[in-house]
């Protein structure tokens, strides 16, 4: 499952919690949430659209965490592409995605992954 592969990878690289859903009991000011928002399969090779939301106590902290996530996702020598089950990592977009309901600062990056 690409979600668990991505979660384990980011946990090994980041110093903040990596979650698959928001934990209402958590008091962490910085964390990331990963979510699969789509997927396809072509010639028996699966692909996935993954979003990674980076949360911070300030807009700057959220943006800085987003940049760190992007660096680890896209690095050719130590990034996600080095994981055996992943054959392609592309950044589709990233943007300020502050949650106006909860007033929490976050950025969101959208990736297209090809995996096995």
Residue spans for each PLM region:
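Small/polar-rich, solvent-exposed N-terminal microdomains that initiate assembly or binding
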Residues: 1-42, 60, 64-67, 71, ...
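Residues in well-ordered beta-strands of folded domains
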Residues: 19, 35, 53, 92, ...
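A broad, low-specificity signal marking well-ordered, structured residues that form hydrophobic/aromatic
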Residues: 31-32, 50, 89, 109
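Short glycine/proline-enriched loop/turn "hinge" motifs that connect secondary-structure elements
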Residues: 41-45, 100-103
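Oligomerization/assembly interface segments of phage tail-like spikes and tubes
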Residues: 45-57, 62, 105-115
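Acidic-leaning, charged glycine-interspersed low-complexity segments
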Residues: 75-114
